[in-house]
């Protein structure tokens, strides 16, 4: 177990199976945080015989980061990594492309699980699989809305004129990957764009 992952996802975000592996760290951290608060409350009550003491205040304040951690754990538990069979199909078409896995982007209204992305200069392609059609059409994930959200975030970091295409169909996504492999484009923005994408992802 990498204890560093209890407090940071640096170096692992964007890697294959990131979402599935990070879940346990989020849950463990949440349990530890709540455990500390409970231990402080019990210690204060045992030593003073009364719950109205300084340690109770500290325990209550400790529930704030614990609750925040719990929200994060719930977010991770609701997501899953890219299916192995899909990953195998995709990886046969990503030679020389810079790729990111398990990128979940959030807005106030939507959650966009883009489980694979390829970045080639100022070109981005992403695969957002549709598990099943929602009962309410308004809750359906929109490839265009996701692309617009990412474009807005990239412009904040001065990455303009970026072509972003998000696909819910695996076949069309693989076709786009093949097209990206044939592009002759400057690679100078790839690393910076990847860093921005990772910074705004779950």
Explain the meaning of each model-derived region.
Residues 1-100, 107, 144, 148-155, ...:
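Surface-exposed interaction regions that form or flank ligand-binding interfaces
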Residues 95-133:
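Acidic, Ser/Thr-rich low-complexity segments on the non-lumenal side of membrane proteins
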Residues 130-134, 158-161:
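Short C-terminal domain-edge/linker segments immediately following a structured domain
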Residues 132-150:
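Mg2+/Mn2+-dependent nuclease catalytic core
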